[in-house]
Regions:
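Flexible cytoplasmic inter-helical loops of multi-pass small-molecule transporters
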Residues: 186-211
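Helix-loop-helix hairpin linking two adjacent transmembrane segments in secondary transporters
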Residues: 138-190
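Hydrophobic core of transmembrane alpha-helices in multi-pass small-molecule transporters
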Residues: 21, 89, 100-115
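Extracytoplasmic
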Residues: 11-45, 49, 62-66, 150-151
């Protein structure tokens, strides 16, 4: 049975895109709440940006580490692990009383968030051959959908309850959306299909090299 570019491949892409849209908010949340934490902790803008800086450091490190975990344990277990890390981080962030503790927590949130970017993109790419380019582009856009969709949803919570409740909403969304969706990604591509994919990738690389030489 054909696995590449199949109906299931597109279904899997849709699920992965939903996971990415929820999972990647860990990168954007601190940007959304930045004015509020600046005001509450009475700090300047440069100090208030420390949580975002450490989020990106955690995100960069997490892409490599989470990628290795995917290689060993599969995408479902990796997403569940990342969801647990982020949920604990969100709940802990609700309790902090200074920007430095928040920054440390955002490092771990960024680390967990990484599972919803590079590793998820790589896993999705295995299910496509002819349409791999558009599939990778679509799943990568989950990061930006996250940054576009969630901020407007948080406006009322920020105005009425404050930034801590935003973290509470994210903790609930991560547990009740990401984890259930991850179980729909448990199926692994067959070794035969994987070999076909690897052979096609190798041929593309050789063609590119020959083109450069010519």
């Amino acid at each position: 049975m054909k696995e590449h570019d199949s109906l299931y491949s597109w279904f899997r892409l849709l699920i992965a895109l939903l996971v990415a849209t929820v999972g990647n908010i860990g990168m954007w949340v601190v940007v959304i709440i930045l004015p509020d934490i600046q005001q509450e902790f009475t700090i300047d803008r440069s100090t208030a940006s420390i949580p975002f800086a450490l989020t990106m450091v955690g995100f960069a490190i997490g892409n490599g580490v989470m990628g290795r975990i995917v290689d060993h344990y599969g995408i479902t277990k990796t997403i569940i692990l990342a969801a647990i890390i982020n949920t604990v981080g969100y709940i802990a962030a609700m309790q902090v009383n200074n920007v430095y503790l928040l920054s440390i927590l955002q490092f771990f949130i960024g680390f967990g968030t990484a599972a919803s970017f590079g590793p998820l993109i790589a896993d999705t790419s295995h299910w496509f051959l002819k349409r791999r380019g558009i599939a990778v582009a679509l799943i990568a856009s989950g990061n930006y959908f996250s940054g576009a969709i969630w901020p407007p949803l948080f406006n009322s919570a920020l105005q009425s309850d404050g930034w801590r409740d935003v973290y509470g909403i994210l903790a609930l969304a991560t547990i009740f959306i990401m984890i259930p969706l991850s179980f729909l990604l448990t199926k692994k591509i067959s070794e035969e299909t994987s070999r076909v994919s690897d052979a096609a990738s190798l041929k593309t690389q050789k063609d590119l090299l020959m083109g450069k030489r010519n």
